[in-house]
């Protein structure tokens, strides 16, 4: 005779050993963000976007997707360059020391709606500088 004994909620959904190292890492990341301050991070991202977005919008052959007002933009800029596949743009930028993501970014319905096969996506965070932009 076999029988099962079910634990009470929420423990019955725990399978095996909890990710202890992950929990410790998450706590350290939260401490790091609290030390810097989320408002400081947001202001830093906005400073970079306010600098770079207008420059990209003025570049011939570059299409920037998203709000044109830097104040309404997040720390991510998606773009395409006429006549060059985004994967090729990403490869060329990588060769110059710039890391961007190219592809559909798990948003295929949006790419179909935009009528593009993919975009390049540059993202900025607290460790990026204006000089890098």
State where each predicted segment sits.
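Pyridoxal 5′-phosphate
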Residues: 1-133
């Amino acid at each position: 005779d076999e029988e099962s004994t079910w634990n009470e909620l929420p423990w019955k959904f725990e399978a095996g050993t909890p990710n202890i190292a992950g929990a410790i890492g998450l706590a350290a990341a939260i401490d790091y963000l609290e030390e810097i301050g989320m408002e400081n991070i947001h202001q830093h991202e906005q400073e970079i976007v306010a600098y770079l977005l207008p420059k990209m919008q003025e570049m011939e052959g570059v299409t920037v997707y998203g709000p044109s007002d830097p104040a309404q933009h997040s720390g991510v800029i998606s773009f395409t360059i006429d006549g060059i596949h985004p994967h090729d743009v990403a490869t060329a930028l990588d060769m110059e020391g710039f890391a961007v993501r190219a592809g559909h970014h798990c948003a295929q319905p949006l790419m179909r709606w935009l009528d593009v096969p993919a975009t390049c996506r540059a993202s900025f965070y607290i460790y990026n500088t204006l000089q890098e932009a």
